[in-house]
Swiss-Prot record:
Zn(2+) binds at D164, E208, H336. The active site is at E207 (proton acceptor), D254 (proton acceptor). InterPro entries: M28_QC (IPR037457), Peptidase_M28 (IPR007484), QC/QCL (IPR040234). The gene is QPCT. Pfam families: Peptidase_M28. This is Glutaminyl-peptide cyclotransferase. Expressed by the venom gland. GO terms for molecular function: glutaminyl-peptide cyclotransferase activity; zinc ion binding. It comes from Boiga dendrophila (Mangrove snake). Disulfide bonds join C143-C169. Glycans are attached at N53, N292, N352. GO terms for biological process: peptidyl-pyroglutamic acid biosynthetic process, using glutaminyl-peptide cyclotransferase. The lineage of its organism: Eukaryota, Metazoa, Chordata, Craniata, Vertebrata.
Length: 368
């Protein structure tokens, strides 16, 4: 997760300004020198979820298994994986293999590019997994899979970034696996509105700074992909709309896995979607589906607001994409230390947040 400048008030104000000016519905956006936009690009602002009832929630949560996720997805990712390292390649192959093996039929693409870093030119590779590339609109769930680069330690320890962001990666893979049946149905649906709304999972490379957080040494993968999507016509063959405009909502996961996280509201224009997370959390609690949980330690807190922090959403925010940033405040105490490892993860918390996210995704995609 992003670096040393994230607590800067100036950076926070800059991000907030973008949030208020660019991300608000109806703010003019220029595509090919024109301001006119197809009606479908406005549908995100009036989109309504299908609220799951208790029976559906019980069914969804019964499909997920945190122990299986831990063994099959988290352990393979809990290795040193800074850009260009052998671990980075291994994790990338694991993510692609897991998604390609699902029945839903994901289109899994590797977006590889080179960028200048403090250590010279490095190769980066984002992973983009799209359920239905022909759908006009996509809910995006994203995280970064790289780990921060540290010089070799005298004690031989390496930084594995458990919360930052191995756990979010594993949660996204578990979401795709446990919801495979429902997502297969969505993929096969040929009737609107389901045919025009789908899911995209993005795993960014190069989120972390190599040396010191700066506009040029950070967010390598998200900066590159946002620029690429802004210049790629969407739907295919379109002349006035692009892939950026096809993003309904950009949900970014980061620093998840420590006990008792508090997620505040960072962007007011997506507060209604944050409210759904809060409501889902309460519903799961009422149904007795959250483990080692106390309502006094609520995760999603709409009564708490914080200035935005710099992360992979920034290049998309600057292009007018609505952002739902799921990052705790304060950060976990192990942030950017060698202690951000498996030993300091809290399995019940991860299981609980994973369930909440899965219900949220189904509701957003109207798969109730």
């Amino acid at each position: 997760m992003a670096g040393e400048r994230r607590d800067s008030k100036a950076a926070a104000f800059f991000c907030l300004a973008w949030a208020l000016c660019l991300a608000l519905p109806g703010f003019p956006q220029h595509v090919g020198g024109r301001e006119d936009r197809a009606d479908w690009t406005q549908e995100k602002y009036s989109h309504r979820p299908t609220i799951l009832n208790a029976t559906s929630i019980l069914q969804v949560t019964s499909q997920t298994n945190v122990n299986r996720m831990w063994q099959n997805d988290l352990h393979p990712i809990l290795i040193e994986r800074y850009p260009g390292s052998p671990g980075s390649y291994a994790v990338r192959q694991h993510i692609k293999h897991r998604l390609q093996g699902l029945q839903a039929g994901w289109l899994v693409e590797e977006d590889t590019f080179q960028s200048h870093t403090p250590y010279g030119y490095r190769t980066f590779s984002n992973i983009i997994s799209t359920l239905n590339p022909l759908a006009k609109r996509h809910l995006v769930v994203a995280c970064h899979y790289d780990s921060k680069y540290f010089l070799p330690q005298l004690d031989g320890k390496v930084f594995v970034g458990a919360t930052d962001s191995a756990v979010p990666c594993a949660m996204m893979l578990e979401l795709a696996r446990s919801l495979d049946r429902q997502l297969s149905f969505l993929k096969q649906s040929s009737l609107p509105p389901k045919a025009d709304l789908s899911l995209k999972l993005i795993f960014f490379d190069g989120e972390e700074a190599f040396v010191r957080w700066s506009p040029s040494d950070s967010l390598y993968g998200s900066r590159s992909l946002a620029q690429k999507m802004a210049s790629t016509p969407h739907p295919p063959g379109a002349r006035n709309t692009n892939q950026i405009q096809g993003i309904d909502l950009f949900v970014l996961l980061d620093l998840i896995g420590a006990r008792n996280p508090v997620f505040p509201v960072y962007f007011l224009n997506t507060a209604r979607w944050f409210g759904r997370l809060e409501a889902i959390e309460q519903s799961l609690h009422d149904l007795g589906l959250l483990n080692n949980y106390s309502s006094e330690r609520q995760y999603f807190r709409s009564n708490i607001r914080r200035y935005p922090v710099e992360d992979d959403h920034i290049p998309f925010l600057r292009r007018g994409v609505p952002i739902l940033h799921l990052i705790p405040s304060p950060f976990p105490r192990v942030w950017h230390t060698m202690e951000d490892n498996e030993e300091n993860l809290d399995k019940p918390t991860i299981d609980n947040i994973s369930k909440i996210l899965q219900v949220f995704v189904l509701e957003y995609l109207n798969l109730g």
